[in-house]
């Protein structure tokens, strides 16, 4: 991540939570890095020691981690569901990895949970690319057939009053 600052003097517990991110990506390249711009990936790797990020800028990532942890716990109670499992496949000597949020074996559906803004209510191309790589990884790991890809968006800035006023606005905080 580079250098982490705390210019707003946030409590040490928040700093510790941000720095205690267990995500490593695994393999040579993760699904999200694979679908990212090569230029962004190369420059980020080349200059990672020069990149400075403030703890306050990581709050939404922290919230996303919390949501994924809660959903993983819930998934443990469900039969025929794989949750938060990291998958790997070799591609020409590169170990590609990706983590599925929820794979429903019986319905052949792969769900990905995104904590996001209402401004992304229609999703993004990167979400579609990520789900397709995860679909491929699931097939490579156990031969799972996936016929449905689903993004479950959790809108951190949802406003019910806006939903009542505007039919094109998301009608629920989770869709």
Model regions: which residues?
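Metal-dependent nuclease catalytic cores that hydrolyze phosphodiester bonds in DNA/RNA
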Residues: 1-110, 117-129, 153, 161-163
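Metal-dependent nuclease catalytic regions and adjoining charged, substrate-binding loops involved
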Residues: 1-8, 92, 137-175
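Short, surface-exposed linear patches
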Residues: 55-57, 132-134, 171-174
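An active-site-proximal "capping" alpha-helix that borders the catalytic cofactor pocket
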Residues: 127-140
């Amino acid at each position: 991540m580079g250098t982490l600052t705390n210019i707003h003097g946030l409590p040490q517990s928040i700093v510790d939570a941000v720095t205690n991110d267990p995500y490593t990506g695994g393999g040579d390249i993760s699904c999200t890095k694979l679908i990212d711009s090569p230029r962004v990936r190369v420059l980020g790797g080349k200059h990672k020691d020069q990149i400075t990020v403030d703890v306050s800028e990581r709050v939404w990532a922290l919230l996303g981690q919390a949501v994924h942890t809660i959903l993983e716990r819930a998934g443990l109670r469900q039969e025929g569901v794989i949750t938060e499992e990291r998958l790997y496949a070799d591609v020409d000597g590169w170990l590609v990895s990706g983590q599925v949020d929820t794979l429903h074996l019986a319905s052949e559906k792969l769900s990905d949970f995104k904590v996001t803004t209402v401004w992304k209510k229609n999703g993004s191309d990167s979400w579609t690319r990520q789900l397709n790589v995860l679909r491929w990884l699931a097939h490579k790991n156990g031969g799972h057939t996936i016929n449905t890809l689903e993004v479950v968006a959790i809108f951190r800035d949802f406003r019910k009053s806006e939903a009542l006023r505007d039919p094109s606005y998301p009608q629920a905080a989770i869709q």
